[in-house]
C-alpha cells in the first residue's frame, strides 16, 4: 500500500466521495478525477455537470487530494452514444450504463490512469473483487443487496479487475452516507442520480426525438386488431404500461394495456391486457456478445442464476454455450418482459460470471 497510487473516478455523488475518503484513510496516494462524458448544448440541462464538478472539487479539497478533470465526450459519442442510437433505431432497448463502464470508465479512463502513473483505478460502484483459488479475480456482488451494481460491470475482464478497487463494495449505503456526514463531505445528502448520465432526469422521449426521427404507426392487440396509434416503436419497451395511450377500447374490459412485442417490419406495436398476460412471459432467451469475467464460460452447459434486468431477484436457469459463442438460456420459471437489447447477467451465489446482450 505504501505510496501505491490510486486514481478515483469522482462523479460529484456520495458513493465516489466516500470511496476517495476511505482510500486516503487507508494510506494510498489518491487523486480524484472527474470524467465529463457529455457536451451539453447551452439550452440543455441534461447533466447538472457544473454542480457535479463543483461538488467533486469540494470533496477533493476537503479530503486533501489533487483534483483533475478529463473530457471523454468524443470517446463517449463514438463508442457509447452512437451504439445506443443504432440499437434504438433497430427497435431494441440498450443499456448505455453497461457500455459506459466497458468503453469509458474501464477502458478510456484506465488508459488515462496509466498515463498519470496510477497503480489502481477506483470507483464508487457497489461491487467487490475476490481472489479465487486458481489465482483469478472474481467479480462479487456488493454487500448491500439493494445497491449491488455487478449487473452493470459484467463486461470487466481479469486485466481490468486486477487494477480496480471498489472501496465501498463491502459497506451498506446508509453507512456510506453516515461516513460522508461524519467527515463533512458536501455530498452527504445529495440525491442519487437516476437515469442515463446524458439524459439525467429529463424526459426520455423528448431527448430521443432530437436524434432519431420517429415513425408513427398502429398499435394492435394480439389478434391483429387496431386499438390505437404509437409515436414511434423506439419509445416503447417490452412490458411498458405508461404512455401507450390506449383506453376505452370497444368491447374490452377496463384493464391496463402493456407493450408485448414490436413488429419492426410493419411498424406495429403489439399490446396485451393485464400485467400477467401470457404473451409478456418467456421461458428462454438467446444472448450474443458474451463477456466472461474469468475469460471463458464455466462449461459448455451449466446451471446458475441470472438477471434479465437490474435489481431483479436471481432466477435459476440452465445456460448452453453455442459454437459461435452465443448462449441459449432456459429458465426454471417463465420470465416477464425479457427485452431485446438489455443484458442477461449470470451468477453462482454472489459471484458474477459474466453476461451478454439479449436478442
From Swiss-Prot:
<keyword id="KW-0963">Cytoplasm</keyword>
<dbReference type="Pfam" id="PF20259">
    <property type="entry name" value="tRNA_Me_trans_M"/>
</dbReference>
<dbReference type="GO" id="GO:0000049">
    <property type="term" value="F:tRNA binding"/>
</dbReference>
<dbReference type="InterPro" id="IPR046885">
    <property type="entry name" value="MnmA-like_C"/>
</dbReference>
<dbReference type="GO" id="GO:0103016">
    <property type="term" value="F:tRNA-uridine 2-sulfurtransferase activity"/>
</dbReference>
<feature type="active site" description="Cysteine persulfide intermediate">
    <location>
        <position position="197"/>
    </location>
</feature>
<keyword id="KW-0067">ATP-binding</keyword>
<feature type="site" description="Interaction with tRNA">
    <location>
        <position position="342"/>
    </location>
</feature>
<protein>
    <recommendedName>
        <fullName>tRNA-specific 2-thiouridylase MnmA</fullName>
        <ecNumber>2.8.1.13</ecNumber>
    </recommendedName>
</protein>
<feature type="region of interest" description="Interaction with target base in tRNA">
    <location>
        <begin position="95"/>
        <end position="97"/>
    </location>
</feature>
<feature type="region of interest" description="Interaction with tRNA">
    <location>
        <begin position="309"/>
        <end position="310"/>
    </location>
</feature>
<dbReference type="GO" id="GO:0005737">
    <property type="term" value="C:cytoplasm"/>
</dbReference>
<keyword id="KW-0820">tRNA-binding</keyword>
<keyword id="KW-0819">tRNA processing</keyword>
<feature type="active site" description="Nucleophile">
    <location>
        <position position="100"/>
    </location>
</feature>
<dbReference type="Pfam" id="PF03054">
    <property type="entry name" value="tRNA_Me_trans"/>
</dbReference>
<feature type="disulfide bond" description="Alternate">
    <location>
        <begin position="100"/>
        <end position="197"/>
    </location>
</feature>
<keyword id="KW-0808">Transferase</keyword>
<feature type="site" description="Interaction with tRNA">
    <location>
        <position position="125"/>
    </location>
</feature>
<feature type="binding site">
    <location>
        <position position="124"/>
    </location>
    <ligand>
        <name>ATP</name>
    </ligand>
</feature>
<dbReference type="InterPro" id="IPR023382">
    <property type="entry name" value="MnmA-like_central_sf"/>
</dbReference>
<feature type="binding site">
    <location>
        <position position="35"/>
    </location>
    <ligand>
        <name>ATP</name>
    </ligand>
</feature>
<dbReference type="InterPro" id="IPR004506">
    <property type="entry name" value="MnmA-like"/>
</dbReference>
<dbReference type="GO" id="GO:0005524">
    <property type="term" value="F:ATP binding"/>
</dbReference>
<feature type="region of interest" description="Interaction with tRNA">
    <location>
        <begin position="147"/>
        <end position="149"/>
    </location>
</feature>
<dbReference type="InterPro" id="IPR014729">
    <property type="entry name" value="Rossmann-like_a/b/a_fold"/>
</dbReference>
<feature type="binding site">
    <location>
        <begin position="9"/>
        <end position="16"/>
    </location>
    <ligand>
        <name>ATP</name>
    </ligand>
</feature>
<keyword id="KW-1015">Disulfide bond</keyword>
<comment type="function">
    <text>Catalyzes the 2-thiolation of uridine at the wobble position (U34) of tRNA, leading to the formation of s(2)U34.</text>
</comment>
<comment type="similarity">
    <text>Belongs to the MnmA/TRMU family.</text>
</comment>
<keyword id="KW-0547">Nucleotide-binding</keyword>
<dbReference type="Pfam" id="PF20258">
    <property type="entry name" value="tRNA_Me_trans_C"/>
</dbReference>
<dbReference type="GO" id="GO:0002143">
    <property type="term" value="P:tRNA wobble position uridine thiolation"/>
</dbReference>
<keyword id="KW-0694">RNA-binding</keyword>
<dbReference type="InterPro" id="IPR046884">
    <property type="entry name" value="MnmA-like_central"/>
</dbReference>
Amino acid at each position: 500500500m505504501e505510496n501505491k497510487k490510486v486514481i478515483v473516478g469522482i462523479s460529484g455523488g456520495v458513493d465516489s466521495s466516500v470511496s476517495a475518503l476511505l482510500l486516503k484513510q487507508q494510506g494510498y496516494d489518491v487523486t480524484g478525477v472527474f470524467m465529463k462524458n457529455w457536451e451539453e448544448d447551452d439550452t440543455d440541462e441534461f447533466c447538472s455537470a457544473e454542480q457535479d464538478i463543483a461538488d467533486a472539487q469540494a470533496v477533493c479539497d476537503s479530503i486533501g487530494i489533487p483534483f483533475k478533470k478529463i473530457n471523454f465526450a468524443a470517446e463517449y459519442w463514438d463508442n457509447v452514444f452512437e451504439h445506443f442510437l443504432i440499437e434504438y433505431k433497430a427497435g431494441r432497448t440498450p443499456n448505455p450504463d453497461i457500455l459506459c463502464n466497458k468503453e469509458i470508465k474501464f477502458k478510456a479512463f484506465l488508459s488515462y490512469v496509466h498515463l498519470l502513473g496510477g497503480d489502481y483505478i477506483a470507483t464508487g460502484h457497489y461491487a467487490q473483487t475476490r481472489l479465487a483459488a486458481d489465482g483469478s479475480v472474481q467479480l462479487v456482488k456488493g454487500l448491500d443487496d439493494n445497491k449491488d451494481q455487478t449487473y452493470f460491470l459484467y463486461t470487466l475482464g481479469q486485466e481490468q479487475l486486477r487494477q480496480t478497487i471498489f472501496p465501498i463494495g463491502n459497506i451498506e449505503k446508509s453507512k456510506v452516507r453516515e461516513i460522508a456526514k461524519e467527515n463533512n463531505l458536501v455530498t452527504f445528502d445529495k440525491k442519487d442520480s437516476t437515469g442515463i448520465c446524458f439524459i439525467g432526469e429529463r424526459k426520455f422521449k423528448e431527448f430521443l426525438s432530437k436524434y432519431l426521427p420517429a415513425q408513427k404507426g398502429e398499435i394492435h392487440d394480439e389478434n391483429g386488431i387496431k386499438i390505437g396509434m404509437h409515436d414511434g416503436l423506439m419509445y416503447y419497451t417490452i412490458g411498458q404500461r405508461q404512455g401507450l395511450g390506449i383506453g376505452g377500447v370497444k368491447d374490452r374490459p377496463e384493464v391496463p394495456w402493456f407493450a408485448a412485442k414490436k413488429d419492426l417490419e410493419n411498424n406495429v406495436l403489439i399490446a396485451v391486457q393485464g400485467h400477467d398476460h401470457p404473451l409478456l412471459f418467456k421461458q428462454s432467451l438467446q444472448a450474443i456478445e458474451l463477456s466472461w469475467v474469468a475469460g471463458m464460460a464455466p462449461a459448455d452447459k451449466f446451471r446458475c442464476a441470472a438477471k434479465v434486468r437490474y435489481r431483479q431477484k436471481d432466477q435459476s436457469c440452465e445456460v448452453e454455450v453455442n459454437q459461435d459463442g452465443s448462449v441459449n438460456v432456459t429458465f426454471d420459471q417463465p420470465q416477464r418482459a425479457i427485452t431485446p437489447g438489455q443484458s442477461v447477467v449470470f451468477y453462482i451465489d454472489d459471484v458474477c460470471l459474466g453476461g451478454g446482450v439479449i436478442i
